[in-house]
Amino acid sequence: MAQVDYSTSSYKTPLHHRILAHMPVVASWVDAESGETINVEGMTENVGESSTLVNLETLPPVGSAVRLRVMEEDKTIIEVSTQVIRVERDPSKPLAALTVLENLKKWKSTAMTAAEAWVTRHWQLNYEEEWVN
């Protein structure tokens, strides 16, 4: 009988890590109609190895180039060029999925490390919450 190995190494499927961290960002892009530069502040929902999901009040069009600055205590920790690959137009939580186009090694080391640090600072266990069954 044949043995099937389901490990990721046998399939060569890359593992992509995402860290759920809410870090402040500033996104800027040029509006195609007016030619004006739009600057919007927002928060990350998650940070991945080559992408991020950000909550922005004004969403850029899919396919547009966005300059993204990830902030920490009012200073920029990394600034990269990104491209919008998907938007979610939920009025209560508008989201844009951005893929990083440059400096992937720096993104992985800087943004991922900052996201891990954010989680460490904000991770709290609350054992006093009531459980709903």
Regions found by a protein language model. Give the residues of each.
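Structured alpha-helical
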Residues: M1-N133
